Amino acid sequence: MGNIERRDRVTASAPRRVAALMYHSVADDSTPAMRELTVSPERFDEQVGALRAAGAQFVRASEVLGLLRGEPIDDAAPIVAITIDDAFADVLDAAAILARHDATATVFVPTAYVGMRAAWLEGEDARRPIAGWSDLAGLRDAGIELAAHGHWHIAADLNPPAVVQEDARRCRALLEDRLGVPVTTYAYPFGFHDRAGRRAIAAVGFDSAFAIFHLHARTGDDPFALPRLHVGPGISGARLAEMVRVRRPRIVEQGLRGKDRLFGAGRHVRRLGPPTSQRIAPYALDDYGRLRFGGGPDDGRP
């Protein structure tokens, strides 16, 4: 595991890029805190329609790694993976829009909160409803991929690796047990990670993991640090169709990656502060370094 970043870099016979798009909520109303993470149904419909009109090839998040490694696909058309984090209840509205455009997506699910509320958020957002297990089963049956977003929605870069690993393992086990589907990919809650966090996720048995980085995923990327492009409410359909095609100069991409790494490194000082929604208390570990799950939203399954 020590050289995972070097040994397992994505390789392919020819460079390839995939635009992994990151969404959170598709709704008409939003709080100030969630405004940039909320796209109205009308805007989402416009965006997906524009991608379809531009000839985009819609793929699942679990397919991205194989495509970057050279699995066959038409390289003349943009490759797009729509991802939706957190499984808010309005994901059902997003799924209906996707179906109208014959498009698929991947929903990253924080399993502790399924059928409950988004308790990791603050203020009134903590009352946002999360899709239930029957809702997720319906999405599965409609061709939407369900993937892992951690159990408690904790940050991979602010918690001990043992906590991150057990949290991700439990999430994967619940999804596979309750929905009967293989779960091979993961999205980091809050988007951040570090080397120890990446190793923890790899140790669970995932094939790939997604962050943010505001870049296309490309041949040569670390499979456990695949970037995504955040799509906000101010992005028109035409602009999004342009975004998935644009090729930034390599020096610009390197600068953006360096900026995100620097910001991520600065987050480590938060480990010294009190527990937050991103970082759990040390006493959550038992004597064997495993994460305790009592005393919170949990259905008692694996």
Predicted region positions:
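C-terminal domain-boundary segment and adjacent tail
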Residues: T38-D74, E176-R178, H193, A203-P223, ...
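Noncatalytic alpha-helical scaffolds and linker/capping helices
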Residues: D85-D86
